[in-house]
């Protein structure tokens, strides 16, 4: 019966991890128990911040640690979806960060994943599949973000905004503060 169904909300965090190769940018996807491809991610532990959760889960699921990642501090994406598990309806919110790595070898946990692969963007979209539109959307956002960063000329960013007398960093609204130890994307000037 629908009335006996329990509703559960959960928040998880993870990473869209990429590396640059001679063939182009490749994205890491994990094969979840022979069912679908997705990013490394997992549940929060008590008192844990979302970035700390993403780092811990990525290390647990892939063997890729913080020391192997160059975290892109000005990117964060969200994915929302729901699914049924037993008599529960689960509503998931996924917080995804973006990070680059040079590490190729991944160590998966067999109880959670049955495989992994590094995919070029268009191949990643294909293996994710039509039913995972949120994952594909995040992958698109990450790919566009990376491509935009590659095209940016060296030197200070070109101002294209409504108030030409203000520096772009004074206009941009920060969506999140950097993790302790990370420099802000646009440091404040004295």
Describe these PLM feature segments.
Residues 2-27:
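Conserved N-terminal beta-strand and adjoining loop/helix that marks the start
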Residues 34-37, 106-190:
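Nudix hydrolase/Nudix homology domain
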């Amino acid at each position: 019966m629908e009335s006996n169904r329990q509703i559960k909300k959960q928040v998880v965090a993870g990473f869209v991890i990429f590396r640059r190769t001679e063939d182009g940018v490749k994205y890491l996807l994990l094969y979840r128990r022979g069912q679908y491809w997705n990013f490394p991610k997992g549940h929060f532990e008590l008192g844990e911040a979302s970035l700390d959760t993403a780092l811990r889960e990525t290390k647990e699921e892939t063997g890729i640690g913080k020391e192997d990642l160059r975290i892109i501090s000005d990117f964060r994406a969200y994915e929302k979806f729901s699914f049924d598990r037993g008599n529960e309806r689960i509503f998931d919110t996924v917080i995804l960060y973006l990070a680059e790595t040079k590490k190729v070898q991944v160590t998966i946990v067999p109880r959670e994943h049955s495989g992994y692969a590094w995919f070029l963007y268009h191949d990643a979209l294909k293996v994710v599949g039509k039913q995972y539109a949120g994952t594909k959307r995040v992958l698109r956002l990450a790919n566009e973000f990376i491509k935009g960063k590659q095209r940016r000329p060296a030197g200070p960013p070109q101002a294209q905004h409504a108030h030409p007398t203000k520096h772009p960093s004074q206009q941009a609204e920060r969506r999140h503060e950097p993790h302790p130890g990370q420099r802000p994307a646009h440091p404040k000037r004295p």
